[in-house]
Amino acid sequence: MTFETTNILVCGIGGQGVMTATEILSEAAIAEGHDVKKTEVAGMSQRGGVVTSHLRFGRKVLSPQIAPGTADVLLGFEAAEALRWAHYLKPGAMALVNDARLVPPVVELGLFKYPDDPIGEMKSRGVRTVSFDAATIARDLGDLRLGNTVMLGAIADQLPFSAEVLLDCIVKRFARKGEQVVEMNRKAFAAGREAAQAAVPA
């Protein structure tokens, strides 16, 4: 994929690793020589609060803000949040969505009604939606914290640089934690990439 500027919107719930994933994506873009701008634009990053970040990179980027209808990819760590931000995608762009539900406190407080079928609603709106259960993949690998690496694997083939560049940034991020942690993240990345490839609509 090649864009003058690549616009990625990442959304989810605090504690899922949304900000860490955005940081790693930005590190990969910088490693490839791109000008990078990113910002957290909504919610609070503490566990349970909604988190949304905008990431833009290219030859020269003036603003970190993504305008509605201009995102090239949406990386949704939580299905209802992905639905809520789907209007930011440009026509024909892809949403990669973890379909495991994590209901935020605003729902429990009655401030927001959780949609019955957020993935189905996205598809009915014509959004090119690729969904998979990142939480189960991470759990099967032995650690739910691997979920953000699973999500990074899922987006790897939608970036204007190779998956190996992104994986290298993940390895560098976790290298200080030891080879076992690095290897678990390698497996999570590969599993997420495979899950997304298998779920891409024809």
Task: Set out the residue ranges of the language-model regions.
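Active-site cofactor/cluster-binding pocket
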Residues: 1-202
